[in-house]
C-alpha cells in the first residue's frame, strides 16, 4: 500500500539506496548496451570479482573500501582490455582467469582476517542498507561523472561500438574510447557491488540491454529503453526486497528477468 511505501521512504538508508541505485542502474544500462553489442558483457563479471578481492583486502587493512576498490578495478579493466586485444589468451579466458584468482584471494584474505562477516556477505550478495553516508555521496558523484562522460562522448562511443575498424580509419582514437568504456564500466561495477553484490552485478549490465534490444530497433532507442527498464526494475526489486525481506540484488535480477520475458514476448509479435 502507499502508506507502507511512504513509511519505507522515510528511512534515510532507503533514500540513499534509491538515489544511488537509480544512478548506478542508469550507468550500468547505458554501458551495458555498448558492452553487449561488442560481445564484451562478461567483463562485468570479471571486474566484480576483482572488486570483491579489492574490498576484502581493503577491509582487512582497515582502509576505505571505495578508495581501494575503484583504482584496483579500473586497473583490472584496462589490463583485461589489453589482454583481450593483443594476446594469445582470448578475452573470455583472460576474464575467467583474473576473476577467479581475485575471488580466491579475496576469500582467503577474509577467512584469515575477519571471517565471513556481514560486510563481506553484503559485497557478495549486495545490501542496499550497507551504504554509509560518505559512500553514498561518493557514489553519487562518481555515477554522475560516468553519466556525463557517456552522454558527452555518446557519438564516439556509438561509432566505436558499431564499427571499430571504420572509426579507426576515420581517425577516432578507438583504443582511447575502448579504454574509456572499460574504465566507466569498472567504476559502475564497484558502485553497483554494494547494492547488487559481486555475484549479480553483471545482470545489471546485461539484462536491460538485452530486453531493450528485443523491441527497439535503433541504438538510441535501445539506450533510452534500456535506461528506463534498468531504473524501473531496480525500484521494483528494492520494493520487493523490502516487503518480502528477500536479498536486494537477487530481487532486482528477478525483476529484470521477468521484464526480459515480457519484452521477448512483445518482440515476437
Residue ranges and their predicted role:
Residues 4-9, 124, 128, 229-266:
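C-terminal binding/interaction regions
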Residues 194-195, 199-250:
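Transmembrane alpha-helical segments in multi-pass inner-membrane proteins
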Residues 5-16, 95-155:
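Transmembrane helix-bundle core of multi-pass membrane transporters
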Residues 33-116, 212-224, 241-244, 267:
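Short loop segments and helix-boundary regions at transmembrane helix junctions
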Residues 148-181:
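Membrane-helix/interface signature in polytopic inner-membrane proteins
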Residues 155-156, 265-269:
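Membrane-interface capping segments at transmembrane-helix boundaries
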Residues 50-60, 98-110, 130, 174-186, ...:
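Small-residue-rich segments of transmembrane alpha-helices in multi-pass membrane proteins
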Residues 17-20, 65-73, 92-96, 140, ...:
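Loop-to-transmembrane alpha-helix initiation sites
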Amino acid at each position: 500500500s502507499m502508506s507502507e511505501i511512504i513509511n519505507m521512504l522515510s528511512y534515510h538508508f532507503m533514500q540513499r539506496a534509491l538515489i544511488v541505485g537509480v544512478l548506478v542502474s542508469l550507468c550500468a544500462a547505458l554501458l551495458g548496451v555498448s558492452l553487449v553489442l561488442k560481445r564484451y558483457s562478461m567483463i562485468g563479471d570479471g571486474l566484480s570479482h576483482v572488486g570483491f578481492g579489492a574490498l576484502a583486502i581493503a577491509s582487512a587493512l582497515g582502509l576505505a573500501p571505495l578508495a581501494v576498490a575503484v583504482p584496483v578495478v579500473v586497473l583490472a579493466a584496462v589490463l583485461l582490455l589489453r589482454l583481450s586485444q593483443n594476446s594469445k589468451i582470448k578475452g573470455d579466458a583472460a576474464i575467467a582467469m583474473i576473476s577467479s584468482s581475485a575471488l580466491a584471494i579475496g576469500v582467503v584474505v577474509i577467512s584469515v582476517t575477519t571471517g565471513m562477516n556481514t560486510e563481506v556477505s553484503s559485497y557478495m550478495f549486495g545490501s542496499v542498507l550497507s551504504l554509509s553516508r560518505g559512500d553514498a555521496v561518493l557514489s553519487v558523484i562518481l555515477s554522475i561523472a560516468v553519466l556525463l562522460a557517456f552522454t558527452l562522448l555518446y557519438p564516439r562511443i556509438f561509432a566505436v561500438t558499431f564499427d571499430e575498424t571504420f572509426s579507426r580509419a576515420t581517425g577516432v582514437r578507438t583504443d582511447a574510447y575502448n579504454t574509456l568504456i572499460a574504465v566507466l564500466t569498472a567504476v559502475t561495477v564497484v558502485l553497483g557491488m554494494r547494492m547488487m553484490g559481486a555475484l549479480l552485478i553483471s545482470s545489471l549490465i546485461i539484462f536491460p540491454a538485452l530486453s531493450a534490444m528485443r523491441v527497439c530497433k535503433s541504438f538510441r532507442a535501445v539506450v533510452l529503453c534500456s535506461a528506463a527498464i534498468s531504473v524501473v526494475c531496480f525500484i521494483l526489486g528494492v520494493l520487493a526486497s523490502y516487503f518480502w525481506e528477500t536479498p536486494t540484488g537477487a530481487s532486482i535480477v528477478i525483476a529484470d528477468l521477468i521484464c526480459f520475458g515480457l519484452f521477448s514476448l512483445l518482440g515476437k509479435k
